[in-house]
Amino acid sequence: MKGKEEKEGGARLGTGGGGSPDKSPSAQELKEQGNRLFVGRKYPEAAACYGRAITRNPLVAVYYTNRALCYLKMQQPEQALADCRRALELDGQSVKAHFFLGQCQLEMESYDEAIANLQRAYSLAKEQRLNFGDDIPSALRIAKKKRWNSIEERRIHQESELHSYLTRLIAAERERELEECQRNHEGDEDDGHIRAQQACIEAKHDKYMADMNELFSQVDEKRKKRDIPDYLCGKISFELMREPCITPSGITYDRKDIEEHLQRVGHFDPVTRSPLTQEQLIPNLAMKEVIDAFISENGWVEDY
């Protein structure tokens, strides 16, 4: 990713007591060697180089974030998380540390924490004017989507359990009433009367069951997984756009978000970095029509 955020230390070691120079590589040289290995996708070897750099100079945040990225590539989020936390102890403004920490937490399904760190990384990148392209926004969209899906799965499971519980209650109540009817008419010679009462009990509980199933079928759409397509979400807030507008570069933003960006950050397109002024923003009426239709058909988006 682009953007140089930390000042890196690790000067060469001095001469030894005997006056002969120390031939071992410096922390910076080890870091550069690790970078070359990383480019070659030799992640374990790169992580080892960054580890040696840390041993030589444990006070440089970038060594930890570089090793954390190796661990992420090797699908070892716990080790990556530890390195990210150490990097943040050294440099609380590190974009990469927050970004990689968010990715670790995303892998570990800690979605709220992941979103918080990814949002912090995005804010810091804007403040420091570092260009990470769509890397951070993309990770943030994924984290929000996974958190939403997790909430939806839990809700669907709870509704399914409720349906099963009510079904068992109705069936148990039916059996109890049928048994009570049988006991109350033991010895009666009029079997027709007993059968009529039992038929009434059966019909009553069949109606209970049918009414309940109808009620659940009416909310069937709510049981399904719900999602907002990425193309309807703003590229700054990552929320459903309400007033989409398009830039000369062809990128669509929510108006309030892009205007805030222009006022607080600078007069350029956040994605393409092209010069941009508020007067160049044009309402995207076609997208607005699509969004309005989506909202009208999916009332749940207000809670998304």
From Swiss-Prot:
Family annotation (Gene3D superfamilies): 6.10.140.2020, Tetratricopeptide repeat domain (1.25.40.10), Zinc/RING finger domain, C3HC4 (zinc finger) (3.30.40.10)
PANTHER family named among the record's database cross-references: E3 UBIQUITIN-PROTEIN LIGASE CHIP
Stretch list, region Disordered: 1-30
Keywords on record: Cytoplasm, DNA damage, DNA repair, Isopeptide bond, Mitochondrion, Nucleus, Phosphoprotein, Repeat, TPR repeat, Transferase, Ubl conjugation, Ubl conjugation pathway
Assembly information from the UniProt record: Homodimer. Interacts with BAG2, and with the E2 ubiquitin conjugating enzymes UBE2D1, UBE2D2 and UBE2D3. Detected in a ternary complex containing STUB1, HSPA1A and HSPBP1. Part of a complex composed of STUB1/CHIP, VCP/p97, CHRNA3, and UBXN2A that modulates the ubiquitination and endoplasmic reticulum-associated degradation (ERAD) of CHRNA3. Within the complex UBXN2A acts as a scaffold protein required for the interaction of CHRNA3 with VCP/p97, this interaction also inhibits CHRNA3 ubiquitination by STUB1/CHIP and subsequently ERAD. Interacts with MKKS. Interacts with DNAAF4.
Catalytic activity: S-ubiquitinyl-[E2 ubiquitin-conjugating enzyme]-L-cysteine + [acceptor protein]-L-lysine = [E2 ubiquitin-conjugating enzyme]-L-cysteine + N(6)-ubiquitinyl-[acceptor protein]-L-lysine
Pathway stated in the Swiss-Prot or TrEMBL entry: Protein modification; protein ubiquitination
EC number, as in UniProt: 2.3.2.27
Annotated domain remarks: The U-box domain is required for the ubiquitin protein ligase activity. The TPR domain is essential for ubiquitination mediated by UBE2D1.
Modification note: Auto-ubiquitinated; mediated by UBE2D1 and UBE2D2 and enhanced in the presence of MAP2K5. Monoubiquitinated at Lys-2 following cell stress by UBE2W, promoting the interaction with ATXN3.
Region span, Required for interaction with FOXO1: 144-198
Location of region: Required for interaction with and ubiquitination of MYOCD: 143-197
Induction: Induced by oxygen and glucose deprivation in neuronal cells. Induced in the neointimal layer of the carotid artery by blood flow cessation injury.
Cited function: E3 ubiquitin-protein ligase which targets misfolded chaperone substrates towards proteasomal degradation. Plays a role in the maintenance of mitochondrial morphology and promotes mitophagic removal of dysfunctional mitochondria; thereby acts as a protector against apoptosis in response to cellular stress. Negatively regulates vascular smooth muscle contraction, via degradation of the transcriptional activator MYOCD and subsequent loss of transcription of genes involved in vascular smooth muscle contraction.
Record-level GO cellular component terms: cytoplasm; cytosol; endoplasmic reticulum; mitochondrion; nuclear inclusion body; nucleoplasm; nucleus; protein folding chaperone complex
Protein name listed in UniProt: E3 ubiquitin-protein ligase CHIP
CDD domains, per database record: RING-Ubox_CHIP
GO biological process, one term: protein ubiquitination
Domain U-box: 227-301
Ranges for the TPR repeats: 27-60, 61-94, 96-128
Residue span of region Required for ubiquitination of FOXO1: 144-304
DNA repair among keywords: yes
Tissue specificity note: Expressed in the adventitia layer of the carotid artery (at protein level). Expressed in the CA1 region of the hippocampus (at protein level). Expressed in the uterus (at protein level).
Composition-biased stretches (Basic and acidic residues): 1-10
Localization terms from the record: Cytoplasm; Nucleus; Mitochondrion
InterPro entries reported for this sequence: CHIP_RING-Ubox, CHIP_TPR_N, TPR-like_helical_dom_sf, TPR_rpt, Ubox_domain, Znf_RING/FYVE/PHD
